[in-house]
């Protein structure tokens, strides 16, 4: 299964009420968790299965299922990694917390658990950022799927800044620093030597609709807007694009576009823009 299957499932079965969908199957009703469950069903085509069948389908489609504390949210078996982000406002940025944006997911990433690294034989995976706008009534208003390689710069861009900040903090005189994976940690701040201070980085990135506003604008008069961007190399790697192209639906559109290279915006790359609305 891949992103093409997910888009086909969306067009054939446009479920957009994430809370009612999750509650009907006795699943998490927090909006973020419900969106993650929705995405799993979208990729595995398990919307209409009972819970036992759904679990079995997910085990077949995914090699790993994670959560906020154990990234990524999912890995398609022999396929891409998936990171799901929920925002409540159409213009909100994405909070990535302590993890910088990723163009790819590498097996040597220190944020990954052993279970994730051992889920299958892999070295590097493309990562799909899936962003949903869920309103207060738990309706999915907007959904975007973009690949990290088209959305984020290479890791060295972020690590360079992080390391410069960490080095600068460590060079502050008169303070006892401790080893940490964070930006810094100061021990023994008070006379009793019982207080410490952690210095953490909190990463964020603008949402895909903001980043790609030069090629796509949402129609706010529609109840639901979907956008996916797939670069040409990735599109050509799939063997099921003909099934998507064969769908006859006026609400579904596929067009050729050019997008900016995140590492050098002066260079453009060919891509497909897939849109759908209700």
Curated annotation (Swiss-Prot):
Q: Which reaction does it catalyse?
A: Endonucleolytic cleavage of DNA to give specific double-stranded fragments with terminal 5'-phosphates
TM helices/strands, residue ranges = none
Q: What's an example Gene Ontology biological process for this entry? A: DNA restriction-modification system
Q: Has UniProt tagged this entry with the keyword Nuclease?
A: yes
- For this protein, the Enzyme Commission number is 3.1.21.4
Q: Name one Pfam family in it.
A: RE_NgoPII
| Keywords associated with the record | Endonuclease, Hydrolase, Nuclease, Restriction system
Give one GO term, molecular function aspect: type II site-specific deoxyribonuclease activity
- For whether the record's keyword set contains Endoplasmic reticulum, the answer is no
Protein family (similarity comment): Belongs to the NgoPII type II restriction endonuclease family.
Q: What is this protein called in UniProt? A: Type II restriction enzyme NgoPII
Native source organism of the sequence: Neisseria gonorrhoeae
Q: Which gene encodes it?
A: ngoPIIR
